[in-house]
Amino acid sequence: MKQFLDFLPLVVFFIVYNLYDIYYASGALIVASALVLVYTWLRYRKVEKVALITFVLVAIFGSLTLYYHNAEFIKWKVTVIYSLFAAALLISQFVFGKPLIQRMLDKEIHLPARVWNNLNIAWALFFLACGAANIYIAFWLPQSVWVNFKVFGLTGLTLVFTLLSGIYIYRYNNTH
């Protein structure tokens, strides 16, 4: 259910874009994201930091898109979010000395430090690559291509990378 809720605003964005335009879709994305955040809080009495940060960026970039009637703002949101994710991963590892992925998962999964480091860097590079791909597709290809990439391409890439990470973790997990 939680994964469906996380994906719901993206589905709303895609549907509204195809029915109307990028501006209605941006407004719908803001509203759907806010509703999911409220529902999550009411249902679980907790909202993850990533969800809150993502919502704030959706609200900011979506509002700028609507206010200035300029789709470039909503297109930048994806790259900004992915860049923040990459920065958080790299800062946790190189400044604070413990990979963020390890902080999130080490209660359930036990891996050697080298594996946590590799996994953390791999995800940071993945997010940077997705952010760079977003810039290219958003600003050099038609808007409809970008919308499909945002909804299906990035989602598919993330699922594949998650699966590959799971395989990598399974190879080194000390609990199996």
Curated annotation (Swiss-Prot):
Family label: Belongs to the YciB family.
Name the record gives this protein? Inner membrane-spanning protein YciB
Q: What is the purpose of this protein? A: Plays a role in cell envelope biogenesis, maintenance of cell envelope integrity and membrane homeostasis.
Q: Which GO terms describe its cellular component?
A: plasma membrane
Kindly give the membrane topology term recorded for this protein.
Multi-pass membrane protein
Name the keywords, alphabetized: Cell inner membrane, Cell membrane, Membrane, Transmembrane, Transmembrane helix
Organism lineage reads as: Bacteria, Pseudomonadati, Pseudomonadota, Gammaproteobacteria, Enterobacterales
Q: Where is it located?
A: Cell inner membrane
Task: State the HAMAP family in the record.
Answer: YciB
